[in-house]
Amino acid sequence: MQKARIKLASTNIKALNEVTDQIKQIAERTGVRMSGPIPLPTKRIRITTRKSPDGEGTATFDRFELRVHKRLVDIEADERAMRQIMRIRVPEDVTIEIELIS
């Protein structure tokens, strides 16, 4: 049987967990084997900029950080389960990538 590998990424961890919970519920309802969600390392993007636009004065800096949370879910590629997963309403800040593997 084929498997589907679902990769989820988002800056909003609550929205990401809601989508993974919906995938879990679909797997339980359809009776399909599932492994995950596996939390992958969080990517931290840091940007440091000078506060002063002209370069005069003391060197003070602003620090900004963006965290990208990722999850990985492997599920059996049952036709019924995959149709239901495709119908999940996904928030704009969550990206989903579905890949079929054998």
From Swiss-Prot:
Organism domain of life: Archaea
Keyword entries, A-Z: Ribonucleoprotein, Ribosomal protein
UniProt GO MF annotations: structural constituent of ribosome; tRNA binding
GO annotation, cellular component aspect: small ribosomal subunit
A Pfam family assignment: Ribosomal_S10
Swiss-Prot/TrEMBL GO biological process terms: translation
InterPro entries named in the record: Ribosomal_uS10, Ribosomal_uS10_CS, Ribosomal_uS10_dom, Ribosomal_uS10_dom_sf, Ribosomal_uS10_euk/arc
PANTHER family xref list: 30S RIBOSOMAL PROTEIN S10 FAMILY MEMBER (PTHR11700)
Role summary: Involved in the binding of tRNA to the ribosomes.
Assembly behavior: Part of the 30S ribosomal subunit.
Family of this protein: Belongs to the universal ribosomal protein uS10 family.
Listed name of the protein: Small ribosomal subunit protein uS10
The encoding gene: rps10
